[in-house]
Design a protein with these regions (language model features):
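Conserved GNAT acetyl-CoA-binding A-motif
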Residues: 178
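Acidic (Asp/Glu-rich) sequence patches and key acidic residues
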Residues: 1-166, 170-174, 182-183
């Protein structure tokens, strides 16, 4: 079963890498993430193309995997116990209305984290999917969450909302954005 994999990411650092044409930075990442880069064909090439600012065409999925490596390199993976094996349709059908009712739907939604946009321009991929929430939107969502109490819901929904709030708290504490991958 698929699930959501979230990362706390200093978005500006990822954006600075893309198009930097810095071979030392690229080689450092390739050395540190050698095993992960070898898992799928084309990821190392996609990473190099991202560094060179050549992100048009090619296998979109390789670019998404390369982006995940950049998110892990510059940021950190966040706990995801409640969403590790969550169905995307269930998340959008059940959890997104909770976020809308709570008033945070303008800033964070499961649909946005599963079918959203990436923090950098890369070719489209059917899989893996994902999206991001910028640092300012993270702060705004937390302001709303901190002001109002969450209505009563079943344990599964509360667990997902708790995970998401934990991600937002961690990101806000470091002035970072949230990038999620769904696979």
């Amino acid at each position: 079963m698929a699930g959501l994999v979230p990362y706390l990411v200093p978005i500006d650092e990822v954006r600075a890498f893309v198009g930097s044409k810095d071979p030392n930075a690229c080689m450092k990442i390739e050395g540190l993430w050698k095993k992960e880069l070898a898992e799928e064909p084309g990821i190392a090439g996609a990473l190099r193309k991202m560094c060179m600012g050549e992100v048009t065409g090619g296998d979109g999925s390789a670019f998404v995997w390369a982006l995940e490596i950049l998110c892990a390199h510059f940021g950190q993976k966040l706990p995801n116990a409640a969403v590790a094996n969550a169905d995307d349709e269930w998340l959008m059908r059940v959890v997104d209305p909770v976020f809308d009712g709570w008033g945070v739907g303008d800033f964070v939604k499961m649909k946005r984290l599963v079918y959203g946009t990436w923090p950098v321009k890369i070719p489209h991929a059917e899989s893996p999917r994902g999206g991001f929430v910028g640092a300012e939107e993270v702060k705004k969502a937390l302001e709303v969450m901190r002001r109002g109490a969450l209505p009563r819901f079943d344990r599964e929904v509360i667990a997902v909302v708790g995970d998401v709030r934990g991600w937002l708290e961690a990101c806000a504490a470091r002035g970072a954005g949230l990038v999620a991958f769904y696979y």
